[in-house]
Amino acid sequence: MDNTLTLIKTVYEINQLEEIAAPQIILAGRSNVGKSSLINCLASRKKLAKISSTPGKTRSLNYYEVSPHGYYIVDLPGYGYARCSKTERAKWAKLIDKYLLDNAYVAAAAVLLDSRHNPQQNDLDLISYFKHCNIPIIPIMTKSDKTKQKDRSKVQKKWEDILKVKPICVSSKTGMNRTRLWNLLDVTAIPELAEIEEETE
């Protein structure tokens, strides 16, 4: 049975935050890295997450429920977009900090990395932030259809050297590694699913 995604909640302000007692996987990455496209790819729907030609359009925390497993993918605002004001960026930072504060339900952070570029300081800073919060990292290299295998492998190796884990390469356009990514997200959010898979093999 294929997973389905449903947008359950959108949070713009700190006072809208409330505890959701279910496993959560954060989806984070630079503006224009392809977060909305990846959500739509995972959901097999074109318009679940709005895609904009303007980077940094996601300005809220978006909670997507994953059925049938009952965990959540929480899409964070994109970072690194210069045209957003300092005030707005500070507001997002406070919202994200508050969301993470004492949130025992965060299972991991899926950090999206553009496969066309070498490691960027913005990405390294974000990964350091999550590690400081003791949040495991799932590195995902997006837009893999736009790169040659040889070039992509070089970037992948650089990230593997930094993170000590090999990023998964995906493409929202072609669906590359979609099923593999779903399996990874499932067992990260609910480790018991890995045991069930082993029993059915």
Swiss-Prot record:
Residues annotated as signal peptide: none
Residues binding GTP, per UniProt: 29-36, 56-60, 75-78, 142-145, 168-172
One GO term (biological process): division septum assembly
One GO cellular component, as annotated: cytosol
GO molecular function: GTP binding; metal ion binding
Residues given in the record as Mg(2+) binding sites: S36, T58
Ranges of residues in domain EngB-type G: 21-191
Cofactor(s) required for function per UniProt: Mg(2+)
InterPro entries attached to this UniProt entry: G_ENGB_dom, GTP-bd, GTP-bd_ribosome_bio_YsxC, P-loop_NTPase
Keyword terms, alphabetized: Cell cycle, Cell division, GTP-binding, Magnesium, Metal-binding, Nucleotide-binding, Septation
Keyword Protein biosynthesis: no
NCBIfam families reported for this sequence: GTPase_YsxC
Family statement: Belongs to the TRAFAC class TrmE-Era-EngA-EngB-Septin-like GTPase superfamily. EngB GTPase family.
HAMAP family assigned to the protein according to its UniProt record, in alphabetical order: GTPase_EngB
Function comment: Necessary for normal cell division and for the maintenance of normal septation.
Protein name: Probable GTP-binding protein EngB
Gene from which the chain derives: engB
